[in-house]
């Protein structure tokens, strides 16, 4: 690592442990990370807090990560406050059960493409985008939330958010949706048909 830049390279494969939680957490001076083709995440099951508090990180491309066996992505990027560019286009999230706090306080993230995400196994989404105060629009129309038990504070204080598509969201009677839109004062374009979630929007 030099001047806050980290390049991961090796002659052979680098395979982290199945539990890769907190792998690079608190690398507060890290500005960029480049993962070479040698970084093999095929056997990883837990990415909880993997980049937690990488507070100086500005861009991150994880499009080559194999996440097909990952079940926990909670807090994966929380407190990455300087992050402006994040590429997760190759992510397979089909068996992920927890996305809670995943982008918590990513305050400078302006764009986020999660169109390839499969949320059908997810049970926890609370605080997922909490404090993403620079996001202006977000399309989560592909999300199937039929198994989600907790959505509390999901978009809390997304204060620049004007457009949000959650047309695929469904909240059961027992799903926690408290304060899901609290602080979303600029949100005027909401695509949603679920009555329980719409009530939270009305009362935000």
Predicted regions and their residues:
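Negatively charged
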Residues: 1-204
């Amino acid at each position: 690592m030099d001047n806050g830049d980290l390049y991961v390279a090796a002659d052979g494969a680098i395979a982290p442990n199945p539990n890769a939680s907190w792998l690079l957490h608190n690398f507060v001076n890290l500005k960029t990370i480049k993962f070479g083709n040698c970084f093999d995440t095929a056997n990883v099951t837990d990415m909880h807090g993997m980049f937690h508090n990488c507070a100086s990180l500005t861009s991150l491309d994880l499009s080559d990560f194999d996440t097909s066996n990952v079940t926990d992505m909670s807090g994966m990027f929380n407190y990455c406050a300087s992050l402006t560019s994040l590429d997760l286009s190759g992510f397979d999230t089909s068996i992920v059960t927890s996305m809670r706090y995943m982008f918590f306080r990513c305050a400078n993230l302006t764009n986020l493409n999660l169109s390839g995400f499969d949320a059908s196994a997810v049970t926890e989404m609370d605080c997922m985008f909490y404090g993403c105060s620079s996001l202006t629009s977000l399309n989560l129309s592909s999300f199937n939330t039929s198994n989600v038990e907790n959505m509390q504070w999901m978009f809390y204080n997304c204060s620049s958010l004007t457009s949000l598509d959650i047309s695929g969201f469904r909240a059961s009677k027992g799903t926690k949706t408290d304060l899901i839109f609290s602080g979303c004062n600029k949100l005027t374009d909401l695509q949603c048909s679920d009555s329980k979630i719409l009530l939270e929007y009305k009362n935000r």
